[in-house]
Amino acid sequence: MVRRFGLIAVAAAALVLAIVSAASARPAAQAAATASCTKGVSIGMQAPITGPAGSIGSDQLHWAEFYFNQWNKTHKLKIHLVQEDTQLDPSKASTTAQALASNASVMGIIGPAGSDEVQAVAPIFRKAGLAFASGSATRVSLTSGAWKGYFFRDVPNDSVQGPTDANYMFTKLGATSGSSVMVVDDQESYSTGLADIVGQSLAGKGVKVDRESVSQKATDFSSLIAKVTSSTKVVFLPFQVASEAQLFAQQLQAQGKTAVAFGSDGTFDSSKFTVNGSYISFFAPDVTTIPADASVVKAFHKQFPGATSPFGAPNYVLAQAYANAVTKACKDNKISRAEVRKDFAKVSLPNTILGGPLRFTAKGDVAGAKFHIFKIENGKYVTIA
């Protein structure tokens, strides 16, 4: 009898071990939802919290944290933020995406920040049934259809940024027919895509385009700057690292060139790109200058003292959108990744801290948004268009 019970115990233990092993081996797509409308729901976030874009990522994280902290003070339904650091590295983004996808309490994702990162994580999040929404990835093809219903963004894409930048160069910076503009990409997909759009837009206006390319790790731009002539009105720098634009603009001025540096949204960092007289385009307004946002900004600075950049606020809006989607799913007693994803796509906010409404198109793009132009004046980013 003892031996029989021993055999039964061994068999039972083996069965339990097999079940546990099988469960731990389940792909993220099969992770059972464990979110609870009474105990709380989790939203994941991917951002470059450290690394070359750490100041941007920290700002993005802080604005999302701030929204959920404020939400949790006044709502019975608690929303928890699960953060992961990508360092603006697609491989790290993939690794952290797997972790979030495997966390069954996570009902949606804010991020990642970069277009290359979005491409890397998209198959993972789609397989896991998760909505993921970026407050900064602008490459046009990200909403081309492959991830429809899964990927969203609350900032305009480069099909808006490119023509906006080109038109400003043409109408305000002297880049007219017969003159030239140097367009320099940093060999990354976001950069090359935006460079293509700006180059094509300028060429269509009769502007000569000198298309160049450098590594994202380059520090000496003398060979390129030597090609800048008196007819070159603008050097367009659609980089993802602000310090690289800083080096280029400094070297441009040091060599006595009159062309102005013009950075894209990836260079928007007032602590790292500070060359006086340079221009930058950006997908969001500076919320610190919007009177209607004064109380929100004041409360944000109370929790997170110090400077903030326009990179952060779109993530506040995404957090707000997720809060709406989760609330709707809980109201319908259908809390699940699929239900949150469906409700997120239908979110309609009549007004946000970005100065306008939020609604997503069928592709997942934000409807009706625009890019803004800033000029660096004595170390400050001043909105000029």
Give the label of every model feature segment:
Residues 249-317, 330, 377, 381:
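Extracellular/periplasmic periplasmic-binding protein-like sensory domains
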Residues 45, 100-113, 131-135, 179-185, ...:
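Periplasmic-binding protein-like
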Residues 93, 154-180, 193, 219-221, ...:
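Hydrophobic alpha-helical segments within soluble ligand-binding/sensing domains
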Residues 28-36, 55-62, 70-144, 154, ...:
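Beta-alpha junction/loop-to-helix N-cap segments that form part of ligand/metal-binding clefts
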Residues 302-312, 323-380:
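Segments of small-molecule ligand-sensing domains
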Residues 49, 150-213:
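An alpha-beta-alpha
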Residues 1-42, 74, 385:
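Short, low-complexity disordered leader/linker segments with a strong preference
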Residues 125-128, 194-285:
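Extracellular/periplasmic bilobed ligand-binding domains
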